[in-house]
Design a protein with these regions (language model features):
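Helix-turn-helix repeat elements of alpha-solenoid scaffolds
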Residues: 45-59, 83-94, 123-136, 168
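Flexible helix-coil transition and linker loops at the boundaries of alpha-helical arrays
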Residues: 22-26, 60-73, 99-104, 136-150
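Residue-level recognition of tetratricopeptide repeat
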Residues: 38, 42-45, 80, 115, ...
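"A position-specific structural signal for the A-helix of alpha-solenoid helical repeats
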Residues: 35, 77, 112, 154-161, ...
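N-terminal leader/linker segments that initiate helical-solenoid repeat arrays
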Residues: 17-61, 65-66, 73
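Sec-dependent N-terminal signal peptides
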Residues: 5-14
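Terminal, low-structured helical/coil segments at or just beyond the last alpha-helical repeat
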Residues: 158, 165-207
Length: 207
């Protein structure tokens, strides 16, 4: 399911922590704490050890008190922890807190809000964020990056989400098929085609 991919993406960009509470400290201290937080969760996840996962959760609580510059990443981590534990309500709550820390132009925020309002059948609000997401794709598609192929694939992925939400899954599938014809070796496109039902579940999941 796409949540597996979601968890991997979250882990890749989440920064980690140490359990001892601090009233003040350097950025190096906070970085070490964040690293410890993530490492503890990964260890608990791999060993299926709930006590380690909850230890990572407690680390995140300490970090929220002292590290004021990485709240987005910390809430991100907390959402992953709750999702892994199967506590969906708390996962959604922490995901929402993470979203509120993002800038309005952040594509993750645009995707989340577009999905949220589509699920809630708030058509005007959904259309607004879908339009913003499409604008983001159009304004960034011609920018040049070191890994141009990955950038183009990411822009196509965001556009696939927007089209699927706005025009329906059938139109989204047509768009994906066109992208595959252009780039048949693209691993992301092939994954999405092979796991299309999971992608549709992802579109209807607020986490």
């Amino acid at each position: 399911y796409m949540r597996n991919l979601f968890v991997l993406v979250l882990l890749a960009i989440t920064l980690g922590c140490n359990c001892a509470p601090l009233k003040r400290g350097s950025q190096d201290d906070f970085r070490a704490m964040r690293d410890s937080m993530v490492n503890t969760f990964q260890q608990g996840m791999l060993q299926h050890d709930t006590s380690l996962v909850m230890q990572s959760w407690r680390m995140s609580e300490n970090l929220l008190q002292v590290d004021k510059t990485h709240k987005e990443n910390i809430y991100h981590h907390r959402a992953v922890v709750m999702a892994w534990l199967g506590r969906k309500k708390e996962a959604i709550e922490n995901r929402w807190l993470e979203i509120q820390c993002m800038t309005d132009s952040n594509p993750d925020k645009l995707v989340y809000m577009a999905k949220k309002y589509t699920i809630e059948n708030k058509k005007d609000s959904a259309h607004y964020y879908i339009s913003k997401l499409l604008e983001f794709c159009d304004s960034n598609k011609d920018k040049h990056y070191n890994d141009q192929k990955s950038h183009e694939g990411y822009m196509a992925y965001l556009k696939l989400i927007a089209i699927s939400l706005n025009e329906g899954p059938a139109k989204g599938k047509e768009f994906l098929d066109k992208q595959l014809k252009k780039d048949p070796g693209n691993d992301l496109y092939k994954y999405l085609k092979d796991n299309w039902k999971d992608f549709l579940k992802y579109l209807n999941d607020k986490t």
